[in-house]
Amino acid sequence: RSRSLRIRGVVTTLRLENQFWDILREIAEGEGLSTNQLITNLYEEVMDYRGEVLNFASFLRVSCTRYLAQRREIVAELSLVGQRAQA
């Protein structure tokens, strides 16, 4: 699915699979942002760090994957804490 948004005053179209849009929306909601605000913030962070963005859609996919991996780690840690509390 494609979505157009304005980054640094330029209308940009991003094409991502629906699952990635859903994950970005989830991340944005957790941060109290709109999806467009989150994407703009991520773009700004990449530009500040690297000075260029070669494949922003790919960067967003990797960001979503990392978010899911971190969430999985947190759930696993909480599960261990719960098991220890029951012992």
Regions found by a protein language model. Name each.
Residues 4-6, 18, 64, 74:
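Sequence-pattern detector for short linear motifs
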Residues 6, 10-59:
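Amphipathic, hydrophobic secondary-structure cores in small proteins
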